[in-house]
A protein has these predicted regions:
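Conserved active-site/ligand-binding neighborhood in enzyme cores
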Residues: 1-302
């Protein structure tokens, strides 16, 4: 999951990481804390029956795209400029190839067989520049298929509980998308059946951005939508009733949006340790069929 915003890296303390929500002292505030916007975090058992966070950042490099000589894109922007001969179109940060990511697919039981077949046979591509042969992915392993269980967490009345966004959250209200803190808190409180009131001495940590994409069939661009960023953290006071460990609200649930993790404060205090993790690597598979098809097309066109 994207690293929650309560996890920070202390720039003036050799990059040490901590969960500032459970820090009793405030000395860390003077060590230039930085949120880890590009990092991923996962919970794991360190062998002492105590859960902790492992945080890892993917390797990034910059890709530069230039126009092909003689094409329309290679023409000078205006007659007064002498640009040409491979004019640069744009550049973008890209994740290194070969990294292994994991996730969970939730579907109705009767469709599980079809979903598994699709995952195994489909050509998976994510992100931008699909036409430039980037972001090709292959399925490495399906670790297991099991029934979805919804755990309930016991809470005490007035106990602070934290809602951590595991994915971006898009919420509509009266026909428009909203991102203001009060409206988002109202939507989350209604789903959890708790008060919108902020517990004393607590605060939210949230960010917003704009999301977009393309239609699967015709590759038409979807409208851009403002959304609350994954990793945002909201705090509420429990009503004393059991709460689910995970909820999903908002728009685009079929695309994995709006997944929220619920943590009572006593559980949050157990997650004081934050350690450096890693992202597994594998040699990217060579797209032999794609290379052969491109070669044939180039040969014919020549």
């Amino acid at each position: 999951d994207p690293a929650p915003m309560m996890l920070v890296k202390l720039k003036n303390d050799n990059g040490r990481m901590n969960n500032h929500l459970v820090q009793e002292d405030t000395g860390w505030k003077g060590l230039k804390p930085k949120t880890m916007d590009s990092a991923f975090a996962s919970l794991y058992d360190g062998g002492d029956s105590q859960l902790r966070y492992a945080v890892a950042e993917p390797s990034i490099h910059t890709v530069y795209h230039h126009a092909v000589n003689g094409t329309v894109q290679d023409q000078p922007a205006s007659p007064d400029t002498a640009e040409g001969g491979g004019r640069m179109l744009y550049m973008q940060d890209s994740v290194e190839g070969g990294m292994i990511y994991g996730g969970t697919v939730i579907c109705p039981a009767k469709l599980s067989g079809d979903v598994i077949r699709c995952l195994k046979k489909a050509k998976l591509r994510f992100g931008r520049s699909r036409s430039a042969q980037y972001a090709a992915c292959s399925l490495k392993e399906i670790t297991g298929v099991e029934p979805l269980t919804k755990d309930l967490l016991p809470t005490e009345k007035g106990e602070p509980v934290y809602v951590i966004l595991r994915s971006d959250l898009a919420v509509q209200e009266e026909g428009r998308y909203i991102t203001d803190a009060e409206s988002i808190r109202r939507a989350l409180a209604a789903e959890l059946k708790v008060s919108e009131q902020m517990p004393q001495g607590r605060q939210d940590y949230c960010r917003y951005h704009t999301i977009g994409g393309y239609q699967t069939v015709w590759k038409l661009q979807k409208p851009h939508v403002p959304a609350v960023k994954a990793g945002s953290v909201y705090c509420f006071a429990a009503a004393g009733e059991p709460l689910p460990s995970e909820i999903q609200i908002g728009e685009f649930p079929q695309e994995g949006f709006g997944i929220c993790c619920i943590l009572p404060e006593r559980k949050m205090k157990e997650l004081a340790q934050v350690e450096k993790g890693r992202i597994d690597h594998a040699e990217p598979e060579k797209q032999e069929e794609h290379i052969r098809n491109v070669y044939i097309k180039l040969l014919i066109s020549a």
